[in-house]
């Protein structure tokens, strides 16, 4: 067995605001005529890039204090074409959702771009259905990738059966329909995150729910300014959940975390592995369930992760894989080919880094598997514990960098991560918070 070494201070912590909700708060503020207020906004590069993009379209932005912003929009029909390209940096959510919204605004012409990593990510998944709605959108990069050139126009009603469970595709098409005041009927095979639907309802709109996987929306839409409170991001909390359950001693109470059922797959997965995590103070805020999460040191074991759970843990699979290394019997993830379309090809990234550590990993087109706390992995750990400066490649991916920082903390290995600046895209202050939890 791999020995548990990490001792934690028993303390309360908070993680930054939910990235998905921070993006969406800007988008709905831009659509809604008048003033909107957001508290708990994630002041990380990705959502700030989305905010900057819509400021160029005519959204007035005022920072009240850290994490709190006031927006004023002239209304969707009075937004203006930007005179420069809209740079979304590394924000896949930002560019895909914004593309849908802008496609439905007649007279608005814009080019949406991003960094080198974003320019490699697939955009055909939104270009095809948007084009079927009548949108003028072209991917100027190879294989329909960004930059995206858009000429906004009035779109037509559309019925779409999504071949993938993707909240980004669903939200993109919803925002296109909302901005263009047209109807949308949407269905998917597995339930994806429903933050856009919740915020849409919170503003006073109705959704005709035909089944849990099938819905309709139709105008007129209610688009008045609102006040949004963004809870802590469970994807960010996931790193500290794994830290807490794999520590030798100490408890963490992670406050004010969004507990949307489409996002709590990480809790289901960890608890099925034997993790003891307690939900406290559960409540509803701005249409989203919120609560506090308390961790207890636990002994983990291998657990089968069903295909139906994959959409709700897709961003947490790297840190869940780290937990799997400490689990009796190891770890296996399948049906997760979507990992290859993230900030990096996360299947390749995790496999190559684990192999660099000497861990035997089986790679599949849709996932990977490896032994956990077996004799063989214990031997690997014993050998690595004497090695200095073991290189880890982050591949410009914030979640890979954070996952291996947690791995480094738990294992005591001298891992040298090539670059950690990517963490700023989602979790500013991560390393400082991590250090503050350790009881030396």
UniProtKB/Swiss-Prot annotation:
Active site: 315 (proton acceptor)
Binding-site list for phosphoenolpyruvate: 19, 92, 121, 168, 346, 399
Gene Ontology terms, MF aspect: 3-phosphoshikimate 1-carboxyvinyltransferase activity
Principal subcellular localization: cytoplasm
Cellular localisation: Cytoplasm
Keyword Cytoplasm among UniProt keywords: yes
Reaction(s) catalysed (UniProt annotation): 3-phosphoshikimate + phosphoenolpyruvate = 5-O-(1-carboxyvinyl)-3-phosphoshikimate + phosphate
Tree of life domain: Bacteria
A GO term from the CC aspect: cytoplasm
Sites where the protein binds 3-phosphoshikimate: 19-20, 24, 166, 168, 315, 342
Pfam families referenced in this protein's UniProt entry, alphabetically: EPSP_synthase (PF00275)
EC number(s) reported in the record: 2.5.1.19
Claim: Amino-acid biosynthesis is one of the keywords in the record: yes
Gene3D superfamilies for the chain: Enolpyruvate transferase domain
Gene Ontology BP terms: amino acid biosynthetic process; aromatic amino acid family biosynthetic process; chorismate biosynthetic process
Keywords from the named record: Amino-acid biosynthesis, Aromatic amino acid biosynthesis, Cytoplasm, Transferase
Listed SUPFAM superfamilies: EPT/RTPC-like
Pathway membership, UniProt: Metabolic intermediate biosynthesis; chorismate biosynthesis; chorismate from D-erythrose 4-phosphate and phosphoenolpyruvate: step 6/7
Coiled coil: none
Function statement: Catalyzes the transfer of the enolpyruvyl moiety of phosphoenolpyruvate (PEP) to the 5-hydroxyl of shikimate-3-phosphate (S3P) to produce enolpyruvyl shikimate-3-phosphate and inorganic phosphate.
PANTHER family: AROM/DEHYDROQUINATE SYNTHASE, PENTAFUNCTIONAL AROM POLYPEPTIDE
Subunit structure, interactors included: Monomer.
Listed HAMAP family: EPSP_synth (MF_00210)
Family classification: Belongs to the EPSP synthase family.
Protein name listed in UniProt: 3-phosphoshikimate 1-carboxyvinyltransferase
Naturally occurring in which organism (per UniProt): Leptospira interrogans serogroup Icterohaemorrhagiae serovar copenhageni (strain Fiocruz L1-130)
Phylogenetic lineage: Bacteria, Pseudomonadati, Spirochaetota, Spirochaetia, Leptospirales
Gene this protein is translated from: aroA
């Amino acid at each position: 067995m791999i020995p548990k070494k990490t001792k934690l201070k028993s303390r309360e912590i908070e993680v930054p605001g939910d990235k998905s909700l921070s993006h969406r708060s800007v988008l709905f503020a831009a659509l809604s005529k008048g003033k909107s207020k957001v508290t708990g906004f994630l002041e990380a590069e990705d959502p700030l890039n989305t905010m900057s993009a819509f400021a160029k379209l005519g959204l007035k932005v005022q920072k009240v204090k850290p994490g709190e912003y006031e927006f004023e929009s002239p209304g969707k029909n009075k937004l203006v074409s930007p005179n420069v390209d809209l740079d979304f940096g590394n924000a896949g959510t930002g560019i895909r959702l914004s593309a849908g919204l802008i496609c439905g605004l007649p007279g608005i012409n814009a080019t949406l771009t991003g960094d080198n990593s974003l320019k490699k990510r697939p955009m055909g998944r939104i270009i095809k259905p948007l084009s079927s709605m009548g949108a003028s959108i072209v991917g100027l990069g190879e294989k329909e990738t960004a930059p995206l050139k858009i000429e906004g126009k009035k779109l037509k009603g559309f019925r779409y059966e999504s071949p993938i469970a993707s909240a980004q595709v669903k939200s993109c098409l919803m925002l296109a329909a909302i901005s263009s005041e047209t109807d949308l009927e949407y269905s998917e095979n597995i339930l994806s995150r429903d933050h856009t639907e919740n915020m849409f309802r919170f503003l006073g709109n109705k959704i005709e729910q035909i089944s849990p996987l099938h819905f309709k929306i139709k105008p007129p839409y209610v688009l008045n300014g609102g006040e949004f409170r963004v809870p802590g991001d469970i994807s960010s909390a996931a790193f500290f959940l794994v830290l807490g359950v794999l520590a030798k001693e100490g408890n963490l109470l992670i406050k004010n975390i969004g507990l949307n059922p489409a996002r709590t797959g990480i809790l289901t997965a960890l608890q099925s592995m034997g993790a003891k995590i307690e939900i406290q103070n559960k409540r509803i805020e701005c249409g989203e369930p919120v609560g506090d999460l308390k961790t207890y040191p636990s002994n983990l074991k291998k657990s089968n992760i069903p295909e139906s759970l994959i959409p709700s843990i897709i961003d947490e699979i790297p840190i869940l894989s780290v937990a799997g290394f400490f689990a009796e019997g190891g770890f296996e993830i399948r049906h997760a080919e979507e990992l290859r379309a993230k900030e990096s090809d996360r299947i390749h990234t995790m496999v190559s880094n684990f192999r660099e550590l000497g861990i035997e990993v089986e790679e599949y087109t849709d996932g990977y598997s490896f032994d956990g706390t077996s004799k063989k992995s214990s031997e690997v750990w014993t050998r690595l514990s004497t090695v200095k400066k073991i290189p880890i490649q982050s591949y410009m991916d914030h979640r890979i960098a954070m996952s291996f920082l947690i791995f480094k903390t738990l294992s005591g290995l001298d891992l040298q991560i090539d670059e950690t600046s990517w963490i700023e895209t989602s979790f500013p202050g991560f390393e400082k918070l991590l250090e503050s939890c350790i009881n030396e």
